[in-house]
Structure formats: C-alpha cells, structure tokens
Amino acid sequence: MAANEKMDVTVKTLDSQTRTFTVEAEILVKEFKAHISSAVGITPEKQRLIYQGRVLQEDKKLNEYNVDGKVIHLVERAPPQTQTSTSGPSTSSSTSPSSSNAAPVPGAPERNGNSYVMVGTFNLPHVMSGLGEASRGPSVSTISGSEPRVRLVLAQNILQDIQRNLDRLEGQPGNEQAAEPMDTAESEGEASSRETLPQTTQNADGQSNSTPTSHPSPSEYVEVLQSLSRVEERLAPFMQRYREILSSATSDTYENQEREQSQRIINLVGESLRLLGNALVAVSDLRCNLSSASPRHLHVVRPMSHYSGPMLLQQAAIPIQINVGTTVSTTGNGTHAGHVPSDGNATPSTNTSEHQRSNSENQPPPSGERPASDAPPNSVPHPHPRVIRITHQTVEPVMMMHMNIQDSASGGPTNIPPPTAGHGGSAHIHMPGLPPEFMQAISNQITQQAMAAASGQQIPGFQAPPRFVFTRPAAPSFNFQPGAAATTPPAPGGATTTAPGATVGPAGNASLAQMISGLVGQLLMHPVVVAQGGSSTSSTTSTSTSTSTSSSTSSSSSTVPTSTTTTTSTSFPNVSSVPSAQLPPGTDQHLSQLLGSLLGTASSGMSNLTMGSPSITVTVPGMPAFLQGVTDILQATQTVPVSTSPPQSASQAPPPPSSPAPPAHSAPPPAAAPESLPPEFFTSVVQGVLSSMLGSLSAADQSGTESIADFIQRLSGSHNIFQPDAEGPGGFFGDLLTLICHNFSLVDMVMLLHGHSQPLQNLQPQLRSFFLQEYLHQADPTPNNIQMASRNLTNGLEEYIRESFASVTVRDDVDITRTNLEFLQDQFNRITTHILHCADSTFGQRLLEMCNQSLFEWLALNLYCLRGDQNALTSVINERIRRLSLDVSPVLVSWVTSVLSLRLQVLLGQMPVTEGEIQRHVRRVGDASQVPEPSSQEQPMETMPVDFQQNGAASPVPATTVEEVLFLPPQSSVPTICPDSEHPTQGDSVSEQWTASVPPEWVPVIRQDLQNQRKIKQQPPLSDAYLSGMPAKRRKTMQGEGPHLSLSEAVSRAMKVTGAKPESSTECVKRELDNSEAQGEYKEQLCQDIQEILQDDESYTAQRFPNTHRAFRGDP
C-alpha cells in the first residue's frame, strides 16, 4: 500500500451517531484519535476504539487492523477518581476540557463534568449485596484515608472543575479546544500543592497504588486555602461581568453572538459559584486543636451528612438502571467514636466520602431543627446516619434515594461489644420479605418512569408525587431516676409541669415520624434512622439495641437516646431496662403496633421510649390523606397529658409487647383513650403507607378502593383469574376466595391483620347470602343442617389433605388426615353458625376473633403432628398456595409465599395456644372414630339439585350409587339436608322421608353402602376422570348438555357424525322415528342390550342394585 494512500474509516459513538473520516493509511491509532477528537468531542486520552471486539492499540498503525471502509466503535473511558500531577505537561493533558461543540447549549459544561464515578447499568439486588461494606465499623481501611484527608481531596477535585470553567472563560470562543488550562502559574502552583497530598495514584497499566493514609497537617490545609484564594481572584472579573449581565437582563435586547457569549458567562460563572460553595463547605469543618501535643493534625467537627436533609422520600422511587451521564454520589461518613480524649482532640472515624450531587445539601435545615454548629467543639455529637444517595443529574426530584445505615460504633461508649451479624456489622445487607424477582418487577416500572422523566418524556397517568421531609428534633433532657419528678415539656401557652412518677403521654412517646420513615425504609433495606436535629449541652449516651420484629426475621437496629445531667454516662443493656415512663395501650401504642408490624420495623420497641415530639415538613404542595391525618393528630395532641400513677422501678418495667399479642401488665390507659382515633384515620394511614410502598404499582388506584382481584389481574396481565367461569380452585373455597377478593382491598386486608374488623362488618350481607346459597344450598340454617353441610364439605377435602401432607414426616401414632378433617368440621360449624345467626354490631369483631383462634389452633395442631418442624409446616402451606395460584404471576406468588413464610415464623414463635390445648383434636392411628363413623351411618344422601351441579363452578360430582340418584329431589323443589330418623334431637317427620321411600329391607343396604363409600376413596369412573381433567369452562359445558333421549335427535346426530345420507328426505326420517311404535321398539331394544350387559358383568349384584328390574325390564 502506498504511503500517500487514503482510507475511509467510519466511527460510531454511543449515541448512535456515525462520522466518516478520510485519513492516511499509515497513520497511527494515537494520531487518529487526535484527529477525530474535535469532531466527537472526546479528548484522545479518554477515547477507546474497538473493532471486532478488539481494542485498537495506540502504537500501531490504523491499516494493520484492516478498517478501511469499516465501522469502528468509540467509547469513552471512565476517568480516574483521583488524579495526581507529576509534571506540567502531563497534568494539562489529563485535565483538558472537552470540546464545547459537543454540547447543545453554547458554554455548557462537558458531558462528564463533576462526575467522579462513572457507572453503566446495574440492578438493585447486586448493589444491595455490596452495600454491606458501607455499614462496617471504622476499623475498615479505605483508600481515601481519614475524614480530613477526604475533605482535602474533595476540595482539590472541586478546584479542578472550577479551573476548567475559568480556563473556558479566559480563552477565546474559537480557541477553546486548543487551550491548555493548566499552563498558568496559578495552576502550576495548584498542581504543586496537590503533590504533597498522599492519595491513590494510577499508573499507565491501570494498577492503583495506595500510600499509607494519615491525618493531614495544617500546612496542607493552608495550601488548599491559598488555592481557593487564587481561584477567587481569577473569578473576580467574571463575577463583575456576571453582575452586569444580570442587572440588565430584564429589558436588554441582544444580538445572536452577544446573547451566546452572555449566556455562556452566566452558565459558567453560576456553575463555578456552586462548585466554590461546595469546596468551602467541604473544608469549613476542618479544625486544629492547638492544645494537643505536636505534631498536630486536622480533625472534623461534623460529618458531611449534616448538610443533607435528614430524610427525603420520593414514594420509595428506587432508580435501578443508571446510564452513563448520571452521577452516583456516595457519602459514607461515620460519626465520632463515642470517646473524647482528655486533650479535646476527637478522633474521627475512617470513612469514605465523595462529592455530593444533590441540591438538598445546600438547603437550610427544616423548621424546628437547630443547626448543629452551635454545639461546642469538644462535645460528643449526635450520631449521624450513613447516607447512600443516588441522584439523577438532570431532574433531581425524580430520582432520589436515601438509605440510612446506622453506624454501630457511633456515639456509644467504648466498652460496648462489637455488633453481631445482622446488627451493624453484617457483611451483606438484604431486603427481608421481598424476593429479587418481585423487586425487579417493581423496579422495572419505576425505572421506566424515572428515565422517561429525566429525558423530558411524559408518561400517561403518572404524576410526580410530593416529596416529604420527616424530621425529629432532639429529645429533651429528662432525669430518669426512679421515684424522681419527671419534667415534661411545657405545653403551648403553659408552664413546665412536674409530677412524681409522671407518665409521658402520646405526644412525648413513639415518634410518629420515626415510625413512618422506618416503615418505608424497611422496604429499601434496614430500618431508617431519622436524623437528630439540634444539640444538647449535656452529655448524651446512645445505646444500640437489637429488637426482634413481628413480620421479619431480620434484626433491626433502634437507637435509644437517653439524656442525663450527671457526669457519668450510663449505658443500659436493653430497652426494657430503661426506667422510662410506660405508654398506655391507647392511641400511640395502637398506632405503633399498626405501623410497626406491617414491615417489621423497630416501632414495637419504640413505643416505650421517651422521645421528642415529631415534626413533619412538607416540601412541596400535595399533602395526601394519611399525612393530613397524621398532622391533625399531632396538632390535637400538643398538650401532653400527665398521669399520677405511682413510680415504677427499672426492674419492674415489663418489656414492650409484640405487635400481634395484646399488651400485658401495662399502665391503665386514660379515659376513652382507645376511642381517640377513629377507624377512618387508620384507614388513611394504611392507604398512604401502601401507596408509598407500592409506588407506581398503585398509580391506577388513587382512591385506595381497588379490590384485590383487580390489583392482581392488573399485575398479572390476565383478566379472567377471578371470573366465575375461569379455571381455578373451584368449589366452595374458590367461590369464597372470589367473593373476598372482589370485595376487599389491600387496605381492608391490612386493617384486618391489625385487628380492625370493620371490613368484615361491611361484608356481612354478602357472607350470609353466600353461605345460604353455596354452603346450605338454600336449606334452613338449623344446627343439624349446618352440621351436615360441614361434614359434606370436609369429606370432600380428604384427598387434598392427604396429598398436602404426603411429602412431610408425621408422628407415627397420629392420623393427620382424620385429625384435620374433624378439626375443620368443628371450626366450620362454629363459624357458619355465627355468620348465619349473628346480626348485631359485634358480627365483624367476633368473626375475626373466631378466625384468628381457629388459625392459631390449626397451626399448633399441625405443628404438633409434624413433630414441631416449622419448615415442614411452611412448605405444606406454600405448596398449596402455589397450586391454587397457577394462573397468577409467578413473581407475585413468590412474593406472597416469601412474606407468608416470614410472617408464619413470627406467629409460630409467639404461639398463644399450648400443646395441651390441642390434644383434644388429635386423632390417633387405630382409635375408634368418635364422630365420623356414627355420623356416617346417620348421614343422609347429599341433596344437591341438578341445576346447581350444572350451573355451578364446582368440580364434577363424585360417583354415587343408583339409589342416591333415584331419590334426588326434583329440580323445582327446595333442597333440604335431612338427618337420620335415629337422631335423638331432630324431627321424625323429616327423617322419615327417605326411609319411607324405599322398602325396609333396603335401608341397611343403603346405609352400609354409604358407610363404605365414605370410608374408602373409590376410583372414579372413566367418564368422571375424563371430566376432571378438563378445564372448568369446558367441563361446565359438557355437564350442561344432558342426555339425548329422543330417537330422532339421536339418529340425526349420528347421521351428521358419520356423514350418512338418508335415501329419502330428512323430514321423512324424522317423522318415522317420532312414531310411537318405533319409539317403543327402540326402548325395548335398549333395555335388552342393557340386560345383556348386566348379565355379563361379574361385579353386578341384584342385592346392591335392587331397582334394576324395574328400570330396565318394565316391571311394575
């Protein structure tokens, strides 16, 4: 190839744009990068050319890769997090700004300006598993060094960005690409100052070498301040021009070029001011203690997380995919160790911090929160949470996530043992209760909305929800000495009130802000710790306590602030030993149980803690109903009620009760305390919490009245799950499930889980009508009819029970099938009697109590039968749920089973039913049946009308004897469930109906047949087996057709099937077949054929089928 030969190369960038360049064939790859840098807007140092999966090496020629006329891909390298300058030319080349021609707006910053971490696409479970390093103690070594070192490095990086902006301001518009920003004397001085800072370096091979870190000296701080001064001097003339432009911007008219230059100055100066402010914030907390021994070092008075809001919630909008061009800013600042040396030089913990990219870091603290800068430098600060923040660079309110991880070693005494696994030092952080598949399904929808909003697209039906800031002021100082007078905060307009052994009322206990924020925080990961506002001059001791939650097996960390005025800090071992006042089981404890047990937060342990009254700040308009209700309650309880109960010592203070269990040994509540909060308030709270948890999944249900059936159908994408004719479990239980899912919403279910029976009370008419029609089949609701219906229903469950417990190990002497059958029969009798006979206002509450009692007894009974194996019982329940949910989305079923497994473990650990109480329900192998056998002899035939069998959605009717079919009542009659004539307490007139209809010698035969059929599960005929394998909709159609008894219809159908054609017309054949003589001959032939079949059948006995001769021989 000749030296002067040209070649065409097409370069494709990540934005799908292609550019064709004509270059010399012998050009080096390095020279080619420099040639295309001005067109693509990426400096040669950041370019990476890829062709056929290979990276083009810079020292090779372009023609060696045979790219003539081909397409090569250009990607941008991620810049190193820290840059160390070794010389002037290398520094200038590594920090050259990108071309401004690549930006759509003249003068806009480069696409990766201020991005110190560049990521591609990641998903939430992977990131969650790696967040465990953020919660480790201060002993973990990090590459960035100590907190003061991180501050200085952060300031240096920010100064580099400011210098880039200044270089663009000082350079000519047409020569910006060729400008060398680091050639100035000031920049050289800046580079020399950075050489003194030991930090991570990166060589040409990409290997990072970390030097030992230490606390920086004050001289290094002085050099950074000098660099700041030089930057301010360079910025001063542009600030003057900036003010002139803004002063005349209201009414001036501009030419095109003048307008572009002025706009460019406004953009660059504004960005520089923001960066300069961040740099000042980063270094403003550095202090030097002159009273300490030399050599003296710098320390930090507060972590960076102080400058961010304590809690920002965007309805749990979790960004899952973050494309290149966004910024992930992580601030892992810990708090001071809970020890202050005598010389006053506090030792800060070793953590990592990066540049925060949120506008919230410059916002003033909310009202009611006093800046912590008022605290003395040598006082122990309040514990601050670690903050992991993901912020979108374009539209910040759309993608905002704060995950606060409590530092286990912060703020506590030095003699506290290290945290155990799952408390503060766990290696990995998981999300209990939500499987990765379900989180991924939710996250995909949220990600699409977040990304579309970031790019300016509109999503139908999506409205940006309001952003809330939940804050809590610092707890006031109380003297918690047993028997001493407790000082309560003064009420508005009142003076401070003291009373011996005062019990702090609802406004002083169980911070509502912490419960709600922890509730949503549990959805993300560990419970969220709301930041403490203000400061206290007295020494404060914080004790981290591990509390067991009610709906999750993971242990959660709750911080118990306890203030004392003595000089000795006291550490309490657990929550129950804190001699704080008892919370009456009324307003806030009920709300604590409601919110605390929903997702397993530490609210149940917070109900007995004395904290400051919460304050809730709404940052944007649009307050939902539940937050409005919370605000109303807080305003209504500003006056702290004080009771005069006798003082209680620390040893007598009972532990906080668990959420499902009622509070025991607690102080008596004030008058009418349980009635202070109406059910409507709890409904609004639950509705708001569910809306925050589900995020975009609940966007279609703004009113909170969407039924569970509609919700599941919307998630699964199928619209026939809960239809009467759809495939499903069928039968009585399928219809009952359909009724509940169509009438209950998610809010109703949560209310029922927390003891509110109003949804059941509202469902009373539908339940009564359903049980009368589907359970008793329009029979009178007498005790005997209810008992008979219960036996019929439970007998049909025998195969299901045997199949469910076939894969687990049962006690050798226990008949688990008969145990469950008789237990369910007894419970159905009780519940059905209550539903059909109770008509007062206690219907819902009593029904809920009966269902809960039955559930606990069933769990305890089967747990005993399974030898106490909880995993076996959980697998039995989950397997049944999976079989009943074949048409539901597998992701949703997996989530339901996971949540149910966690909830079941908690319930089994708090079982109120003892093993001795359920022994009466246990049935042993070989024992004589006390209830089923006599009842099987007394039980009459099932009197279900034929039209119900044809029109119902139940499974096919099992095979019955000929006698049962013959003595079914006609379709027009009202069915009754008739008892046996030998029943001592029932009417003889009703019981004589079926026995009087047959000869007396056949009564024992029928009874024996019924008993045998109920004792042994017979194999169904082939016809029933065929029907049972059909879909429910097809099976119903088949059952509804009925037999064709007309001879003419039968022959016509046979002709159509076989394709035969009559010699005469079809009408003529029909007339001949409708003749009575032909009908008689046909019937006679049919009976003769059946008689021959019966004679050849060895299993046929005339004693078992005594009416055969009357049916097929025409005998009278």
From Swiss-Prot:
Keyword Chaperone: yes
GO BP annotations, alphabetical order: brain development; chromatin organization; endoplasmic reticulum stress-induced pre-emptive quality control; ERAD pathway; internal peptidyl-lysine acetylation; intrinsic apoptotic signaling pathway in response to DNA damage by p53 class mediator; intrinsic apoptotic signaling pathway in response to endoplasmic reticulum stress; kidney development
Keyword field: Apoptosis, Chaperone, Chromatin regulator, Cytoplasm, Nucleus, Secreted, Transport
Every Ubiquitin-like domain range: 7-82
Matching InterPro entries: BAG6, Bag6_BAGS, Ubiquitin-like_dom, Ubiquitin-like_domsf
Domain of life: Eukaryota
Chain intervals with Pro residues compositional bias: 653-672
Disulphide bond pairs: none
SMART domains according to UniProt: UBQ
Chain intervals for the UniProt region annotation (Disordered): 76-114, 170-221, 329-385, 473-502, 533-589, 640-678, 1058-1080
Cellular component annotations (GO), alphabetically ordered: BAT3 complex; cytosol; extracellular region; nucleus
Polar residues bias (residue ranges): 194-207, 344-353
Basic and acidic residues: bias regions: 1068-1080
Residue stretches of biased makeup (Low complexity): 79-100, 208-219, 482-502, 535-580, 641-652
GO molecular function, one term: proteasome binding
Location in the cell: Cytoplasm, Cytosol; Nucleus; Secreted, Extracellular exosome
Known partners and oligomeric status: Component of the bag6/bat3 complex.
Function, as annotated: ATP-independent molecular chaperone preventing the aggregation of misfolded and hydrophobic patches-containing proteins. Functions as part of a cytosolic protein quality control complex, the bag6/bat3 complex, which maintains these client proteins in a soluble state and participates in their proper delivery to the endoplasmic reticulum or alternatively can promote their sorting to the proteasome where they undergo degradation. The bag6/bat3 complex is involved in the post-translational delivery of tail-anchored/type II transmembrane proteins to the endoplasmic reticulum membrane.
This protein's name: Large proline-rich protein bag6-B
